[in-house]
């Protein structure tokens, strides 16, 4: 059966997906011509597609490139991360002053598909339910892998106010609102740790569940799964996997 790679990262800067998926599936020209036949432009549609706010810089782009290459090379490799609602933030300048606002991208037609799969995650003595979303990663004329994204059903976007301010202590409502929330105070630092733990605990449970579905004996886990940690954010997956086993 071979081993499957799980690439755990706090960021996945995957960019807009419509044109990329059409090209990888060999359907770009067909889609462009079909739209042109009814007086529409594919490029206009590409312009209004919201970009998934799942990453910010080089770390996220590296993760996205790895996933793209794995799929193109027909190698079994899935990503594991968080389904941020607003990403980092949307920056604008008014009268020479920087303004930070939420950058919403999630819609009813998001590429990330909601599943019925959930995992319990305990934070500060309270149990939360991590919901799995799956986003298809298409390779160029290759296989399709998956970016597994975790979120809480209880997240409340309405608590964000005055730009990107929010109650950092309301974990059930804020946990996946932003990528890299402000950590200048203790509440912010705790929130970041909770984010990272949600990602690695749910991710580790996903890995073990998929391994079990393939008939894996956990003593032979290394023959079924390889885990890549992208920077320090997912490093808690090591003790968490030990704890679960």
Q: Can you say where each PLM-predicted feature lies in the sequence?
A:
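A conserved ligand/cofactor-binding region detector
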Residues: 1-245
